[in-house]
Amino acid sequence: MTKSELVEKLAARFPQLLLRDADIAVKTILDAMSDALADGHRIEIRGFGSFGLNRRPPRVGRNPKSGEKVLVPEKRVPHFKAGKELRERVDRSLERQGDSSSEGEPVSLTAVKAARQAGGHHAAGFPAEATPTLVMSR
């Protein structure tokens, strides 16, 4: 869902709100959340989740062009942790859908390689309409 879609959904749910007013409300909320995170605060929305900051320590990187070592300074990056109610709601939704919807599900690199060797992702047990999504994380 994009910000524009969220604004439209808010305006549709509350007919007394003009689209412009819904847009202002969404922007105001997002600005307040951004400001809080920029100031180092944690945001908790019970039942939905929490936004916080993770620290990435300084490290030595490489300039890809020259190969020269470069010191990458410490960073603080925003992080979202889903709340229990949201996790359970998403899980229940996936259970209701069963195996019929695998779009966007993480697939291991091993499964993708095996599917290619076997003649495509259909041969590896993926539904014909689904294309495996490779998810890489640290």
From Swiss-Prot:
<comment type="function">
    <text>This protein is one of the two subunits of integration host factor, a specific DNA-binding protein that functions in genetic recombination as well as in transcriptional and translational control.</text>
</comment>
<protein>
    <recommendedName>
        <fullName>Integration host factor subunit beta</fullName>
    </recommendedName>
</protein>
<dbReference type="Pfam" id="PF00216">
    <property type="entry name" value="Bac_DNA_binding"/>
</dbReference>
<dbReference type="GO" id="GO:0003677">
    <property type="term" value="F:DNA binding"/>
</dbReference>
<keyword id="KW-0810">Translation regulation</keyword>
<keyword id="KW-0804">Transcription</keyword>
<feature type="compositionally biased region" description="Basic and acidic residues">
    <location>
        <begin position="81"/>
        <end position="98"/>
    </location>
</feature>
<dbReference type="InterPro" id="IPR005685">
    <property type="entry name" value="IHF_beta"/>
</dbReference>
<keyword id="KW-0233">DNA recombination</keyword>
<comment type="subunit">
    <text>Heterodimer of an alpha and a beta chain.</text>
</comment>
<keyword id="KW-0238">DNA-binding</keyword>
<dbReference type="GO" id="GO:0030527">
    <property type="term" value="F:structural constituent of chromatin"/>
</dbReference>
<dbReference type="GO" id="GO:0006417">
    <property type="term" value="P:regulation of translation"/>
</dbReference>
<dbReference type="InterPro" id="IPR010992">
    <property type="entry name" value="IHF-like_DNA-bd_dom_sf"/>
</dbReference>
<dbReference type="GO" id="GO:0005829">
    <property type="term" value="C:cytosol"/>
</dbReference>
<comment type="similarity">
    <text>Belongs to the bacterial histone-like protein family.</text>
</comment>
<dbReference type="GO" id="GO:0006310">
    <property type="term" value="P:DNA recombination"/>
</dbReference>
<keyword id="KW-0805">Transcription regulation</keyword>
<dbReference type="GO" id="GO:0005694">
    <property type="term" value="C:chromosome"/>
</dbReference>
<dbReference type="GO" id="GO:0006355">
    <property type="term" value="P:regulation of DNA-templated transcription"/>
</dbReference>
<feature type="region of interest" description="Disordered">
    <location>
        <begin position="81"/>
        <end position="138"/>
    </location>
</feature>
<dbReference type="InterPro" id="IPR000119">
    <property type="entry name" value="Hist_DNA-bd"/>
</dbReference>
